[in-house]
UniProtKB/Swiss-Prot annotation:
Bidirectionally degrades single-stranded DNA into large acid-insoluble oligonucleotides, which are then degraded further into small acid-soluble oligonucleotides. It catalyses: Exonucleolytic cleavage in either 5'- to 3'- or 3'- to 5'-direction to yield nucleoside 5'-phosphates. It is found in: Cytoplasm. The keyword GTP-binding does not apply. This is Exodeoxyribonuclease 7 large subunit. Belongs to the XseA family. Its main location: cytoplasm. The lineage of its organism: Bacteria, Pseudomonadati, Pseudomonadota, Gammaproteobacteria, Pasteurellales. GO terms for cellular component: cytoplasm; exodeoxyribonuclease VII complex. Keywords: Cytoplasm, Exonuclease, Hydrolase, Nuclease. Signal peptide: none annotated. It comes from Pasteurella multocida (strain Pm70).
Amino acid sequence: MSEHIYSVSQLNQTVRVMLENQLRQVWLTGEISNFTQPVSGHWYLTLKDENAQVRCAMFRMKNMRVSFRPQNGMQVLVHASVSLYEPRGDYQLIIESMHPAGEGLLQQQFEALKMQLAAEGLFAQHLKKSLPPFCKSVGIVTSQTGAALQDILQILRRRDPSLQVVIYPTAVQGKEASAEIVQMIELANRRQEVDALIVGRGGGSLEDLWCFNEEMVARAIFHSQLPIISAVGHETDVTIADFVADLRAPTPSAAAELVSRDQQALLQQLVYQRQRLEMALDRLFKQKDDRLQRLRLRLHNQHPQRQLSAQKQLMQQLAHRLDWSMQAVLQQKQAQLRVLWARVEKNPLPFTLQKQKQDLAQLKVRLDVALKRELTFKHHQFAALCTKLDSISPLKVFARGYSIAQNAQGVAITQLKQVSVGERVITRLADGEIVSQVTDLRPRS
């Protein structure tokens, strides 16, 4: 035999691969029967019509997204992949999503429009507009009598009473709702009286929310110059408007929080920033005060009056040393004279007396010469020190015609920026001070 011989396992595997590759995913409508849910959480059921039936499975991670509880006898629309359970040779459907039969047709339309608009780029993230950092006014496109509007207004009044609100009333359910929503979006864009728009309504069935899945509404949102927040239904409800809008809020209340500022949080942030500013200013003032004290100390140590006092003290010390030196020499010579006089008194002989008188006269002459020489030398030293002291004295600079300007606190003025017009200035000269008032400041050109 030239034909390939399959084992049962090989045949079932081949059929499974063919089914999965050829059919992949299909939409199927039918009646539920034999519905079971074991402890694993998976759903097992049969879909049938008047002529046939097929086994189906829907795993737990998928059936958690279904918004209703399947019942036997219920007509549903499922999106499923075709497969074959190899151990028993039973072909089956692996269900990806499930909707009631009426909503199922709408879901097909939803998926088709979603794919079309996505292909056209209406969902592109880079085209979405950002909300202003702080909205001053917000528009609300919704039913004027719906609970969603009251929820939004309540949140806005609590969080940001200063926010201006403009309501664009429209139907949010029924045949005319889509056209009215488009008209209100276009009206808000023409008026340009708000910073952002909230477009939405409260929860409902897929049919109730269908106006937000219409193509005309999607295109009006896309072409809006104002940023739009979609706030349709509950968190589990997803519409075409959510994909096109610049921002999606899970509920109308959440949309109100997105466009409003929490005043309490802003006040807390303001207090925090004020505390930081005060601390920074305190640090800056302390740094500047420390630097000012250091500069004052340096100025005090380098002040001309202080230097003059130091030189004067040095001159007094030198004069004292000169006086002490001259007194010491004089006392020494007087002591020598007393010794000689005592020797003369002990020897009464005229000859000796005459000789001693001559010696005394000579010593007196020599003493006078020595005293004059020493006194002249010390005077020369003193004059030299005075000349040196005078040459380094700040008063010498004054004598040559220079002066020093100081402010009212005695701080030397070296730059124009240290004084201002109208301020009192003291100019120190060699023989006194001039007190004047600044009338003009002229920078060096």
